Regions:
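Helix-enriched interaction subdomains in cytosolic or periplasmic regions
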Residues: 1-6
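Soluble catalytic domains of membrane acyltransferases
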Residues: 7, 14-142
Length: 142
């Protein structure tokens, strides 16, 4: 309920202020495990992807974002923390659990925002989680 409310609010704001145009939603399967793998340019990328997707989306987010109050809001909206700089087994397991339950996990495979707009080297986590959960991977571009 809260997720849908926040998603619809962002959809209105993005449509009015950013003139958000979404293409390719027909490529998002209606059910089953799904990884949305996207480039990452801005702090607005997670709400843009969540708004554009036709299903509820869970996000891995750097653990530094999970400060009091804000971290609780992120968790209510389906995000979970990941420790960057190495293999965070708990976060990887949580991502696989989300996928194995037939849900959607959005990942920014580069692990950080691009400062130049160029694609960086992808980390192996997205492919590994999708493979273990037998999830479909849908690429996204913002």
């Amino acid at each position: 309920m809260i997720y849908t409310l926040v998603k619809n609010l962002f959809k209105i704001l993005f449509t009015i202020f950013l003139r958000l145009k979404v293409e390719g939603t027909e490529n998002i399967p209606k059910d089953g495990p799904l990884v949305i793998a996207s480039n990452h340019l801005s702090l607005l990328d997670p709400p843009v992807l969540g708004t554009a997707a036709t299903r509820k989306v869970h996000f891995m987010a750097k653990e530094e974002l999970f400060v009091p109050v804000l971290g609780t809001i992120y968790k209510i909206l389906g995000a979970f923390p990941v420790r960057r700089g190495g293999a965070d087994r708990a976060a990887i397991k949580h991502g696989i659990d989300i996928l194995e339950s037939g849900q959607v996990l959005a990942i920014f495979p580069e692990g950080t925002r691009s400062k130049t707009g160029e694609l960086g080297k992808a980390q192996p986590g997205a492919l590994m989680m999708a493979s273990k959960a037998k999830a479909t991977i849908v690429p996204a571009c913002i």
